[in-house]
Amino acid sequence: MSDLQDKISIVTGANSGMGMATVEALSDKGATVIMLCRSEERGRKALAELTGEKARKLDLMICDLGDFASIRSFVRSVKAKYPRIDILVNNAGFISLDRQETKDGIERQFGINHLGHFLLTTLLLDRMSAGSRIVNVASGAHKVGKIHFNDINLHHGYNVVRAYSQSKLANVLFTRELAERLKGSGITVNCCHPGAVATNMGVDRETGFGKTITGLLRPFFLTPAEGAATAIYLATDEAVSHISGGYFYKCQIAKSSKRSKSRRTAGRLFELSEEMVRE
């Protein structure tokens, strides 16, 4: 799959950081890339930057992963325009010091990082077939995570680590369970830890919190392109064409937490997620 001519792909969180690096890499290989962005302004800026360098087949489409109605509308638009989806890279991420909620009343980190991508992916499955690939950008933070089934929206004892690690563990569990459910279809789904990447994800746009810390630590971070390398590998490389349900780091299978390997927890989370996104 190294030549992606005629391949149609979607990248979420496509306007900056690893998402933008992923769009660049896939389009460089010839793919048509649908750029899913929440902000039209930031999306247009990224699109102009990417198409200013060279001719690329890019399609900017606006969608808020924290709004189920917006996701359903996006999927309807995609299906009206494209006959199939060959690659889906669920890259968008959100992190916040204070507890916030999505438009649907879900704790925002779980709502965007997991549920938004869960709904997007499951709605697009009927446009995928043998050879299609799904890549979920997870994080090593899943290793300290736990799924709080009795308080999934973290109304009690919220803190940023608890919320973020829960959402990232959900990414790994979703990958495992979906891989089981897709067995025999030829569609693969894998996830990865990108490493420590200097992106704007941790920066609160209102207060600027995180900018100083990010600035000080920037020399120790990976670039967005380096961080995106494993997701791009999973989306395109022949070496992983028959691997599904894996957790990768630096383009290799990596060790994930004990909790992330529980079939019972994965199945329970999948069923809860279906229930939470139901219209």
Identify what each model region corresponds to.
Residues 1-203, 276-279:
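Rossmann-fold NAD(P)H-dependent dehydrogenase/reductase core
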Residues 42, 205-208, 265:
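Short acidic-hydrophobic sequence patches enriched in Asp/Glu that either
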Residues 53, 208-209, 248-250:
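A short glycine/small-residue-enriched secondary-structure motif
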Residues 107, 150, 210, 214, ...:
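Generic detector of well-ordered alpha-helical segments enriched in charged/polar residues
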Residues 154-158, 213, 253:
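Short glycine/proline-rich turn/loop motifs
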Residues 167, 191, 214-255, 261-271:
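C-terminal helical subdomain
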Residues 183, 206, 236-239:
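Hydrophobic alpha-helix feature that most strongly marks membrane-spanning transmembrane helices
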Residues 198-215:
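A glycine/serine/threonine-rich, flexible loop-to-helix segment
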